[in-house]
Amino acid sequence: MRPLFDREGMHALDLVLRARPLLAFDFDGTLAPLVERPDDARVPVEVSRSLDRLARLRPVAVVTGRSVADVSGRLGFSPRFIVGNHGAEDPGRSAQLDASCLDGLRAHVAARRAELDAAGVQVEDKGFSLTLHHRVAHDQDRALACIRSLLAGLDPRLRPFGGKFVVNVVAAGAPDKGDAVASLVQRAGCGVAVFVGDDVNDEAVFVRALPNWLTVRVGSDDPDSRAGFFLSDHSEVAALLNVMLGVLRTV
């Protein structure tokens, strides 16, 4: 990854914006800062105002691990597209995913609720996925051991994957964020995309991005990330949006 805010990065951003791209963003850790309690997450006012202005110039998408219903009220603006549950929940898709294969895991969670609570593991059921949060656990080793035990012998129809202090579980055949962004590019009638994300599930976009896309990771802490560029931290997201506005107003 290379820093976005240098000469090469700014040149790449200018080129892709002049190609009239889809602008796609993750939510937690990207548009909204990471917080201890997931329910407290909101897009800062300065960021939401910039996004609202961008949405009048280009199609904007939010592609998040949260459910569509959950994230919609946290944005402060109306994007053209919202895709939730790591790509599995797309209201614009003609056929919705059958997530009934999660029911067995739901029953397993209910049976072990006391053990999970004692270990500091919070379970979030988002319909198309389950998320096991362990950010607030006092003993991280104990929390992770509890999660591993819960998922031992997991139904092969399910797929677990990690994130920042979370383990997510979706249907094995569920679309991921890479599938979602590729679909949105086509539906928006765009030839290119800008995608900004910060977590493990955003790598699905970074890995499969076409050469003319611009991919940006928030944070440079993962040397193996396949993003093309990086921002130092969440505080630089607002600056990026302002640069985008400046360029798009001249196109």
Please place each PLM-identified region on the residue numbering:
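Non-catalytic pre-domain segments flanking phosphatase-related domains
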Residues: 1-27, 32-38, 46, 53, ...
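Mg2+-dependent phosphoryl-transfer enzymes with acidic/Ser/Thr/Gly-rich catalytic loops
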Residues: 2-6, 18, 176-251
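Residue-level signal for inorganic ion chemistry
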Residues: 29, 82, 132, 181, ...
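Active-site phosphate-binding/coordination module
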Residues: 34-36, 42-126
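Substrate-recognition "cap/lid" segment bordering the active-site pocket of phosphatases
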Residues: 83-107, 161-190
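Charged, glycine-interspersed solvent-exposed loop segments at helix/strand-loop junctions
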Residues: 120-138, 158-171
